[in-house]
């Protein structure tokens, strides 16, 4: 049985590979920030789960930000940040701004070039996270992410799919 979707872009015929996200990368998160390290008026926005994707209500010092950004995991431009508690699975594309994110509540998949971020963002919008079906637990653990199955085409096809849906999202946003 061929592993391909019913509907495809012209010119693509290869099978899609079945993988687990954990085979393609690892979960990364920022270093923990304690409440006494934040303020309402420092320089660098600190996003907690309640402000993720909107306006920050806490900030950290430039000095702490620069130190933690160098020493600990930090997203790269284009990485897809995921909320792991509250509204599980909400995503934000990291645009390269100086900002910091609440550890373990906001995570991203650190992966190699076998995965395209635009494709991954679309996958996140439809994924059924492994181990969460029917669960009352409102938490997405690293294991849930890493054990989740994903079907992936070639990176060229991933890019084409990702770009198509990004343009569709932009068009919809324009007309709202």
Identify the function of each model-found stretch:
Residues 2-6, 78, 131, 146-147, ...:
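Histone-fold recognition with a strong bias for associated Lys/Arg-rich disordered tails
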Residues 5, 159-171, 175:
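Extracellular/lumenal glycan-associated surfaces
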Residues 8-31:
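Non-catalytic DNA-recognition/assembly elements of restriction-modification systems
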Residues 14, 129, 154-155, 170:
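Loop/turn elements at beta-strand to alpha-helix junctions within RNA-recognition modules
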Residues 22-25, 35-66:
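DNA target-recognition patches
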Residues 48-49, 59, 63-125, 141:
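A short beta-sheet element
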Residues 58-61, 135, 174-176:
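Short, tandemly repeated low-complexity microdomains enriched for cysteine and small residues
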Residues 84, 100-106, 135-159:
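A short glycine-rich beta-alpha junction/loop motif
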């Amino acid at each position: 049985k061929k592993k391909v979707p019913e509907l495809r872009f012209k010119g693509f015929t290869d099978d899609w590979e079945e993988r687990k996200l954990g085979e393609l990368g690892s979960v990364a998160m920022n270093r923990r920030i304690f409440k006494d390290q934040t303020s309402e008026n420092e320089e660098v926005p600190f996003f907690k789960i309640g402000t993720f994707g909107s306006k920050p209500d806490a900030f950290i010092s430039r000095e702490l930000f620069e130190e933690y950004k160098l020493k600990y995991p930090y997203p790269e431009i284009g990485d897809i940040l995921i909320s792991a508690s509250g509204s599980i699975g909400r995503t934000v594309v990291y645009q390269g701004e100086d900002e910091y994110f609440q550890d373990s509540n906001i995570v991203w998949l650190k992966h190699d070039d076998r995965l395209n971020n635009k494709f991954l963002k679309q996958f996140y919008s439809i994924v059924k996270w492994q181990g969460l079906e029917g669960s009352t637990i409102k938490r997405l653990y690293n294991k849930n992410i890493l054990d989740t199955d994903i079907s992936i085409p070639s990176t060229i096809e991933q890019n084409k799919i990702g770009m198509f849906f990004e343009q569709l999202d932009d068009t919809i946003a324009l007309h709202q």
